[in-house]
Structures are given as C-alpha cells and as structure tokens.
Amino acid sequence: MPNIKSAKKRVKVSERNRLINKAYKTRMKNSIKKVLLALQEGKSREEVEQLYKVAQSAIDKAAKIGAIHKNQASRRKSRLIAKINKHFASKE
C-alpha cells in the first residue's frame, strides 16, 4: 500500500487506465472474432468487408490510445485482411 501522496495517485490513475485499455482491447478482439465467424459461416464478401471496417476501426482506436502498439495494430489488420482474401480467393 503506497504511503506517499503521488504514489497513491499513480495507483488510481494506473487502475483507471487499465480499465480503459481493457475496454478498447475487448472491443477490438470481439470485432475481430465477428469477422472470423462471418468467414466460417460463409457470409458474402460485402458483409465480411463491412465487419472488417468495424474491426479495423477498433484496432486503430486501440493503437491510438496506446492500449496496443502501432506495429501490433498493423500486424493484426494485415493478417485479418490476408485471411479474408485467402478465403474468397479459394471460393473463386
């Protein structure tokens, strides 16, 4: 337990930031799961791309506030679009 005033404040601030980061990461992961689920269910390319836009936005927002690193955001987006392209390339 911190005794110094600034240390007490840091505990509060870090807990608040942890919860904010957790919310952004959860939103990001859920949107990615929706895209992957749509691929498994065989949804149309338009529907999947619409879900991808939502996921891309969630990933970028998480990176913007620092919940994830910008390189991780880039990697997640590129891997997700690669899966989408691979899925629809095999269908054609």
Curated annotation (Swiss-Prot):
Keywords: Ribonucleoprotein, Ribosomal protein, RNA-binding, rRNA-binding
GO biological process, any: translation
InterPro entries in UniProt: Ribosomal_bS20, Ribosomal_bS20_sf
GO CC entries: cytosol; small ribosomal subunit
Pfam families referenced in this protein's UniProt entry, alphabetically: Ribosomal_S20p (PF01649)
GO molecular function: small ribosomal subunit rRNA binding; structural constituent of ribosome
SUPFAM superfamilies in the cross-refs: Ribosomal protein S20
Its biological purpose: Binds directly to 16S ribosomal RNA.
Family statement drawn from the similarity comment of this UniProt entry: Belongs to the bacterial ribosomal protein bS20 family.
PANTHER family, per database record: 30S RIBOSOMAL PROTEIN S20 (PTHR33398), SMALL RIBOSOMAL SUBUNIT PROTEIN BS20C (PTHR33398:SF1)
UniProt-recorded name of the protein: Small ribosomal subunit protein bS20
